[in-house]
Amino acid sequence: MTTPKPVVLCILDGWGSAEPGPANAPYLAKTPTLDAIMQSCPTARLVTHGPDVGLPSGQMGNSEVGHTNIGAGRVVAMDLGQIDLAIEDGSFYDNDALQAFIAKLKETGGAAHLMGLVSDGGVHGHVTHILAAIKAIRDAGVPVWLHAITDGRDVAPKSALTYLDQLEAGMAPGAQIATVTGRYFAMDRDNRWERVSEAYDAMVKGAGQFTAATARDAVENAYGRDELDEFVKATVVEGFDGIKEGDGFFCLNFRADRAREILRAIGEPGFAEFDTGPRPALAALLGMVEYSEGHNAYMTTAYPKRAIVNTLGEWVAKQGKRQFRLAETEKYPHVTFFLNGGKETPEVGEDRFMPKSPKVATYDLQPEMSAPEVTAKFVEAIRAGYDLIVTNYANPDMVGHTGDLDAAIKACEAVDQGLGEVVAALKDAGGAMIVTADHGNCELMVDPETGGAHTAHTTNLVPVALVGGPEGTALKDGRLADLAPTLLALMGLDQPEEMTGESLLV
């Protein structure tokens, strides 16, 4: 067969497959391009959750997991399952890095400050991991202060009290909640340093916008101010007055992208994104995982990353091919760092472009986000002679997370409008494109149980379609790990033996 060029992977982030209905944004949106693709091109569906992407059964997928599996071309055992298993078999409590952290604090007499996302969403962190870490440290006699980050995004928007109750019921004696802050502030990933500084001031200085007698009061007071869990303003619980010299800090989130900024503020030498004031000298700074090569310079790690050999990008580079990666800020790490198996440096012949995500408080205020700029660069790349292009449209996921159905519909329409230009350019170039998603989200915008907004990912299958493929080709159902082998097959390249995924082409 004639090898198409370019071969393209277009990821519609958070665009799941579901029955038509009043909460299904892709169904309600006017999407003539995608409708035509789904009607006239080979299509199938992919699994994006649970063991098929290296997660525990029933655990919804997410963008980090999705892009890691896509780029690896094999099912990658993810950190959530690894940590869960370690807690279950007891090896977590004997973890070398954790024991060294405890030993350092026993030496200095300092307290351990733990920070984590208090929910069971399992995307960035898990309440059971927090409880296990508290137990390990309290069993060693070290005082514990917990900096609780409320979720409301990977779980229901007003569920924080349930998780705080679970936390306080299971928390080892002698541990106290020091601060309560919504993830909007503590887990930014878009250089909104004004948000991060509010979380920093509460955690490090003990100086929040608000104070409360208890963690429960902090959340109830936030609800009184009409703040949902994600947006709880930094609140200091009475009795906490900041991190002291000789204390230690342990970040329990196991996903890198939304932990990096707050950790830079707390530990990076020469940090200058905002004025932190004098920072207390920490005796130890520990992370559940590796957050970046830069963070490794001043942090230790409980669960270092495992090398993924011969990812899609690495293998394509080894064949002397040129490739291009494209996404706006919110999803840029996913098409670069995560797709390349946790490797930050581009491969030889790998070019990248990142339009900036719009500076709005929440993306329902600008549901088109930077899709027009992504599309313009996408079309330019198709015409530029690359062999492989990987692009991510952030809109369906980022706007889906706001819970605003009308905005999610507009987000889908903005992406479809861009796809129209892309398909035309692809046809002119003689290329082929796989269109799919990394997980579901915007196809379920109303919680079927509560009737309120649904802001989390789903476990729905996602669509996959082949545009401009070889004549007579069909697609079979599969999982995300099958996408890299499919792209390689379209490029006329053998897949490396490490890739255990199977081409979807039939």
UniProtKB/Swiss-Prot annotation:
CDD domains, per the entry: iPGM
Record-listed Mn(2+) 1 binding positions: 397, 401, 457
Functional summary from the UniProt entry: Catalyzes the interconversion of 2-phosphoglycerate and 3-phosphoglycerate.
Pfam families, per the entry: iPGM_N, Metalloenzyme
Sequence positions that bind Mn(2+) 2: 13, 63, 438-439
PANTHER family: 2,3-BISPHOSPHOGLYCERATE-INDEPENDENT PHOSPHOGLYCERATE MUTASE
Assembly: Monomer.
Active-site residues from the entry: 63
Family listed: Belongs to the BPG-independent phosphoglycerate mutase family.
Involved pathway(s): Carbohydrate degradation; glycolysis; pyruvate from D-glyceraldehyde 3-phosphate: step 3/5
Superkingdom: Bacteria
Assigned keywords, A-Z: Glycolysis, Isomerase, Manganese, Metal-binding
UniProt keyword Phosphoprotein present: no
Protein name: 2,3-bisphosphoglycerate-independent phosphoglycerate mutase
HAMAP family named in the record: GpmI
UniProt source species: Ruegeria sp. (strain TM1040)
